Amino acid sequence: MSQNEPNPLVIFSTLAAIILAAVAVYVVKLNKKNGPVLKPDVFQKFPLIEKTRLSHNTCIYRFGLPKSTDRLGLPIGQHISIGATINGKEVVRSYTPISRDDELGYFDLLIKTYEQGNISRHVDSKSVGDHIEVRGPKGFFTYTPNMVEHLGMIAGGTGIAPMYQVLTAILTNPDDKTKISLVYANVTEEDILLRAELDLFAKEHPDRFKVHYVLNNAPENWNGSVGFVTPEIMEKHLPNKDQDGYLLLCGPPPMISAMKKNAVTLGYPKARPVSKLGDKVFVF
């Protein structure tokens, strides 16, 4: 080989080093991009990028993260706080995203707009491109895979949000064997939120997830229960107090008060005013 000819081994080694360096830089950047965006003590602005109306007063709002590869950074079972200045007063309310934390670039909120709901009306007034201010995570419940054998859930209305967050994380994780039983109460059949998603989960995981619907005003030929969630309904469709699991509750205050009393009737310990991780009866 002539002294002026390039050495193939040197060329190959140089190219390999360049490729490895590029891969290393990409991995570092990717890891940085996938870091959590949320900050517990600082409100940050996130733009509304999509609004899907489910009913006359309920929407799924999708908010964008700074980068398409960012994740929100919300542990399963935790929620976020939305803050706003309304009529000169600082108002803060908590909401649970229904999107998974491994869904990158955005997060989804299921919100029902109430006439007297300051934050819900504030969010509903937003157009695509407008921002809301969010901080988090917060909350006393953090789910980890296989932490219990069986979870019982009772949800009312938009109280389905934290339940959906938890059950989605469980049922999309092939290594998590936790069973889930959900009793979901609403006024009318049209009020049942995320029904298609819940029914699909029940169909795909018949041995691990069961959902029972309860309506105040039921149509003819209704297959679920009618009226309020009673101790009898709970006893039939939820795990009993002696099983390895928790009873999770989320819904309107009057409903939650009644569910706490029903739980005591069935032998569950009395729920604390502020629930903590490990409580047999946990209220979101």
Curated annotation (Swiss-Prot):
Its main location: mitochondrion. Residues 41-144 form the FAD-binding FR-type domain. It catalyses: 2 Fe(III)-[cytochrome b5] + NADH = 2 Fe(II)-[cytochrome b5] + NAD(+) + H(+); 2 Fe(3+)-[Dph3] + NADH = 2 Fe(2+)-[Dph3] + NAD(+) + H(+). It is a single-pass membrane protein. The gene is CBR1. It comes from Meyerozyma guilliermondii (strain ATCC 6260 / CBS 566 / DSM 6381 / JCM 1539 / NBRC 10279 / NRRL Y-324) (Yeast). Pfam families: FAD_binding_6, NAD_binding_1. Gene3D superfamilies: Nucleotide-binding domain of ferredoxin-NADP reductase (FNR) module, Translation factors. Keywords: FAD, Flavoprotein, Membrane, Mitochondrion, Mitochondrion outer membrane, NAD, Oxidoreductase, Transferase, Transmembrane, Transmembrane helix. The chain crosses the membrane at residues 8-28. It comes from the Eukaryota. SUPFAM superfamilies: Ferredoxin reductase-like, C-terminal NADP-linked domain (SSF52343), Riboflavin synthase domain-like (SSF63380). One of its GO terms (biological process) is tRNA wobble base 5-methoxycarbonylmethyl-2-thiouridinylation. GO terms for cellular component: endoplasmic reticulum; mitochondrial outer membrane; plasma membrane. Pathway: Protein modification; peptidyl-diphthamide biosynthesis. Monomer. Component of the 2-(3-amino-3-carboxypropyl)histidine synthase complex composed of DPH1, DPH2, DPH3 and a NADH-dependent reductase, predominantly CBR1. One of its GO terms (molecular function) is 2-(3-amino-3-carboxypropyl)histidine synthase activity. Its cofactor is FAD. This is NADH-cytochrome b5 reductase 1. NADH-dependent reductase for DPH3 and cytochrome b5. Required for the first step of diphthamide biosynthesis, a post-translational modification of histidine which occurs in elongation factor 2. DPH1 and DPH2 transfer a 3-amino-3-carboxypropyl (ACP) group from S-adenosyl-L-methionine (SAM) to a histidine residue, the reaction is assisted by a reduction system comprising DPH3 and a NADH-dependent reductase, predominantly CBR1. By reducing DPH3, also involved in the formation of the tRNA wobble base modification mcm5s 2U (5-methoxycarbonylmethyl-2-thiouridine), mediated by the elongator complex.
